[in-house]
Amino acid sequence: MLPSQSPAIFTVSRLNQTVRLLLEHEMGQVWISGEISNFTQPASGHWYFTLKDDTAQVRCAMFRNSNRRVTFRPQHGQQVLVRANITLYEPRGDYQIIVESMQPAGEGLLQQKYEQLKAKLQAECLFDQQYKKPLPSPAHCVGVITSKTGAALHDILHVLKRRDPSLPVIIYPTSVQGDDAPGQIVRAIELANQRNECDVLIVGRGGGSLEDLWSFNDERVARAIFASRIPVVSAVGHETDVTIADFVADLRAPTPSAAAEVVSRNQQELLRQVQSARQRLEMAMDYYLANRTRRFTQIHHRLQQQHPQLRLARQQTMLERLQKRMSFALENQLKRAGQQQQRLTQRLNQQNPQPKIHRTQTRIQQLEYRLAEILRAQLSATRERFGNAVTHLEAVSPLSTLARGYSVTTATDGNVLKKVKQVKTGEMLTTRLEDGWIESEVKNIQPVKKSRKKVH
């Protein structure tokens, strides 16, 4: 039996149009976070890229009138947050995202602020080596600016007590995390300079995320460190954590414990150095006395050996020895020269060059033939690949669509016209053809009523 009502039959164009309308009307604008990849910017100024996460990706476009409001240059691998409309490109049936706005997501925004401040302060020469103050050697009093409850303070005090128990330490407690932390750190630095009790300051905290360490990327903290008359050692986080404070400080220590090592004297090491110096001095004195005694003995012996009869006897013996060596060397030289002449004569007779020349010429001819064959084959393959690539590029080029007689019309706001209700009489329109643009004014609007076929 036939069903009472046949299912609706869609053309491909109608199907794509229906899906596009469903996406645009049902979804509306959405916020999407993801990682940028395959970013390109053709001559039109539009941006084309892919947003992806661990399991999926979607193609995106951001037109020139929208991307000119973005305050940063998107980079491959950057995490971003976009506000976009979901649509379908009807000619190809491709689902894509039209991005209206973009901003860095999460730590990407913090990293961007970090780089901007770093570039700004570097341009003002706050990082230059010429402004770095030398640390006192030795330090007579150490100031520590950090949290009074943090592990960093415990580590610093532990190292100072172990290395230099007599070194005075003054603690300027401050918050190192949160919105109020930068202001407190600045006030602590200024207070230390006003009281002028210390000759070196340690400013830092323990490790954490980029957000946790952000107080030490604050411009106010950086300028306070730069303005400090007392030398500042930065000790923020772990060795891999680098903050703006590290660049401005007079010295950067990889950890708070390392900062304490830098500013303190190791008393045990000093004692070992004194003992070592004493031992070296004693050894030097012993060596000097032994050397003087040995020198005196040598001079005394040389005086005894310089008798004229002894000198004549030694010279006579040496002359006879040299005569024997000269005769023996001359005989050996003549013998070796004769043997060498015989070997050269034999080698010359054996090394007739004609056979070798013939073999080399034959080999060269074979290689020339093989090289010509390889070059012809590679040239043919390259021409074939180039032809295929040109054909493929021409097939997928958007300009090919325009060349077949199609055009794209946009309103004054840059939106592509799809229906007559998007325009009004008197508005100016821009039409893109294969070879250029046409600006026109709407004189008359005539909607076309679509006829519906009754389905039996």
UniProtKB/Swiss-Prot annotation:
Against CDD domains, the record matches this protein to:
ExoVII_LU_OBF
Subcellular location per the Swiss-Prot or TrEMBL entry:
Cytoplasm
Has UniProt tagged this entry with the keyword Nuclease?
A: yes
Instruction: Using the UniProt record, give the first listed, main subcellular location.
Output: cytoplasm
Summarize the protein's role. Answer: Bidirectionally degrades single-stranded DNA into large acid-insoluble oligonucleotides, which are then degraded further into small acid-soluble oligonucleotides.
**Subunit annotation:** Heterooligomer composed of large and small subunits.
Give GO terms for biological process. Answer: DNA catabolic process
From the UniProt record, which GO molecular function terms apply? exodeoxyribonuclease VII activity; nucleic acid binding
- Gene from which the chain derives: xseA
What protein name applies here?
Answer: Exodeoxyribonuclease 7 large subunit
Gene Ontology CC: one annotated term: exodeoxyribonuclease VII complex
- Any idea which UniProt keywords this protein has? Cytoplasm, Exonuclease, Hydrolase, Nuclease
Q: What is its EC number?
A: 3.1.11.6
Q: Which domain of life is it from?
A: Bacteria
Homology family: Belongs to the XseA family.
Catalyzed chemical reaction(s): Exonucleolytic cleavage in either 5'- to 3'- or 3'- to 5'-direction to yield nucleoside 5'-phosphates
Instruction: List residues traversing the bilayer.
Output: none
